[in-house]
Curated annotation (Swiss-Prot):
Membrane topology: Single-pass membrane protein
Claim: Transport is one of the keywords in the record: yes
Cited Pfam families: ATP-synt_B (PF00430)
Alphabetical keyword list: ATP synthesis, Cell membrane, CF(0), Hydrogen ion transport, Ion transport, Membrane, Transmembrane, Transmembrane helix, Transport
GO CC annotations, alphabetized: plasma membrane; proton-transporting ATP synthase complex
Protein's UniProt name: ATP synthase subunit b
Length: 184
């Protein structure tokens, strides 16, 4: 079948040269597109690919840097937590030590106050015993003078009698106390 003999209607060339010129023009246009347009498109595609690839690489680098920074901050945070725990433990131990020292000081002060109070009580007791002995001695001498009917003016003899009387009184209550304790 011959192309020229086909019924192409309005598309049918009037002269066979038109087909040759058409084919040459199509080949020329194809060559022109291949030499001028395609390299530009390829260049644009390559630039676009490089831009995208560079963006991806930059994003990956940024992500890696962010991950490294996150790990660094997490390590610093863990270190800070450990340090805070250490400081808290030190503060607790120092607080316990301070409390122990304050208790010891308070106990020493309480012991000193108790000792001072006991000494003062003992001094007051001794003073009261001396005063009571002197008064009892005077009363005993007066009573003895009335009973005997004579004046007991010899101080040494009076003092010896009073001391003997008081020591017998001192022995009696402790003996009666021991009897009371044994009964209980």
């Amino acid at each position: 079948m011959n192309i020229l003999e086909m019924d192409l209607g309005p598309l049918a060339p009037e002269h066979p040269i038109e087909i040759i010129v058409g084919v040459i023009l199509v080949l020329l246009l194809t060559w022109l597109i291949a030499k001028a347009v395609v390299p530009r498109f390829e260049k644009l595609y390559e630039e676009r690919t490089e831009t995208i690839q560079g963006g991806i690489e930059r994003a990956e680098r940024a992500q890696a840097e962010a991950k490294a920074a996150l790990e660094k901050y997490q390590a610093q945070l863990a270190s800070a937590r450990d340090e805070a725990a250490q400081i808290r433990d030190d503060a607790k131990s120092q607080g316990a030590q301070i409390i122990a020292e304050m208790r010891a000081n308070a106990q020493e002060e309480a012991d000193r106050i108790t000792e001072r109070a006991n000494a003062q009580i003992q001094a007051e007791r001794d003073q009261a015993v001396r005063e009571v002995r002197a008064e009892i001695g005077g009363l005993a001498t007066t009573l003895a003078s009335r009973i005997v009917g004579e004046s007991l003016q010899d101080d040494q003899r009076v003092q010896a009698t009073v001391d003997r009387f008081l020591s017998s009184l001192a022995d009696e209550p402790s003996a009666s106390n021991s009897r009371t304790v044994n009964r209980a």
